From Swiss-Prot:
This is Iron-sulfur cluster insertion protein ErpA. Its cofactor is iron-sulfur cluster. It comes from Citrobacter koseri (strain ATCC BAA-895 / CDC 4225-83 / SGSC4696). Pfam families: Fe-S_biosyn. The lineage of its organism: Bacteria, Pseudomonadati, Pseudomonadota, Gammaproteobacteria, Enterobacterales. GO terms for biological process: iron-sulfur cluster assembly. Binds 1 iron-sulfur cluster per subunit. Iron-sulfur cluster binds at C42, C106, C108. Required for insertion of 4Fe-4S clusters for at least IspG. The gene is erpA.
Length: 114
C-alpha cells in the first residue's frame, strides 16, 4: 500500500525505522512486523507483536521505508484509526499502539478494553 493512501492504521516513521534495523539484524529481508490482538491482559484484550515472513489471505500490509507492517482482519477491526509507533524513554524502548477505539487501557499500555 502506498503512503499516499488514507490507511485505517498508521505505521509511524519511528516504528518503521526500528523495524528496518531489527530486520537487518535478523538477516531476513522477507520479515515484516505483525501486530495482532488476543484476549487476555488485565483489561480484556492485549496487543502482540512478532516478526513474520508470511502474509496470509485477508491480511493488510502497510509499507514504509521499505519494510512492512502486517495486520490480520480480525485484529484490524479493533485497530482502525490507530497507530503503531516506537518509543524510547526512561521506561525502556518498545512498540506501542495508540488506539482510539480503546475505552480503557492498563498502566503498562499493552492491554485494553472496548
Amino acid at each position: 500500500m502506498s503512503d499516499d493512501v488514507a490507511l485505517p492504521l498508521q505505521f509511524t516513521e519511528a516504528a518503521a525505522k526500528k523495524v528496518k534495523s531489527l530486520i537487518a539484524d535478523e538477516d531476513n529481508p522477507n520479515l515484516k512486523l505483525r501486530v495482532y490482538i488476543t484476549g487476555g491482559g488485565c483489561s480484556g484484550f492485549q496487543y502482540g507483536f512478532t516478526f513474520d515472513d508470511q502474509v496470509n489471505e485477508g491480511d493488510m500490509t502497510i509499507e514504509k521505508q521499505g519494510v512492512g507492517l502486517v495486520v490480520d482482519p480480525m485484529s484490524l477491526q479493533y485497530l482502525v484509526g490507530g497507530a503503531v509507533d516506537y518509543t524510547e524513554g526512561l521506561e525502556g524502548s518498545r512498540f506501542v499502539v495508540t488506539n482510539p477505539n480503546a475505552k480503557s487501557t492498563c498502566g503498562c499500555g499493552s492491554s485494553f478494553s472496548i
